[in-house]
Amino acid sequence: MQTNWMKEEIVRQCKIPAERVQVKFPPVEMLKTDPWQMEEEHAVFFFPAGPPAYKNHRTFLKACELLKKRGCTDWEAVWTLNGDENDGIRALKKEAEEKTLPIRFVGMMSREDLFAQYARSVLVFPSYIETIGLPLLEARSVGAPILAADCLYARDGVGDYEKAEFFETFNAKKLSEMMERFCR
């Protein structure tokens, strides 16, 4: 198993003795980059994720909408999608454009660009199904703040990291309140 929460679920569901299941965290190569520092002009909320529905882009988009409605305008969101991956993502991009939300669809990034983005952003990670949640580990490695869905994988992935905060998975209002604290 890759994580403790996966081990606990296997033990519980398969009724296997816990001592027979080992957690072997996969090796993850972190790139050297400058330590985290917030963008000077505005907050940047970064969501590196593919297009599957379980990544929960909808909750993030709703949080962005609520943030804008409260008058917070000095921010942008950066998504590693190009906006035409599937019907669901196309609909989200169209909605973001119609509501003039500052969500940039930048497409895939090199590892170097990815780590540079972590170093100047707040990671928002609303996904509700992951094994490890690699972006959590990557953002933590540069000292970036993390706003993550309150799921077992996320708690396991960030451990006792003091810059991690959690929101109920589909609670866009709570996420927007957490994001607002980073706005100037």
Map each language-model feature to its residues.
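Aromatic "clamp/platform" in nucleotide-sugar-dependent glycosyltransferases that forms part
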Residues: 128
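Conserved acidic donor-binding segment of nucleotide-sugar-dependent glycosyltransferases
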Residues: 164-173, 181-183
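Conserved donor-binding/catalytic core segment of Leloir-type glycosyltransferases
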Residues: 38-55, 61-64, 78
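Short hydrophobic beta-strand element within catalytic cores of glycosyltransferases
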Residues: 124, 145-149
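Nucleotide-activated donor-binding/catalytic signature segment of Leloir-type glycosyltransferases, i.e.
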Residues: 89-112
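Short acidic alpha-helix that forms the nucleotide-activated donor recognition element
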Residues: 110-121, 141, 155, 159
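Donor nucleotide-sugar binding/catalytic pocket of nucleotide-sugar-dependent glycosyltransferases
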Residues: 1-12, 16-32
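Glycosyltransferase donor-sugar binding loop
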Residues: 75-90, 107-108
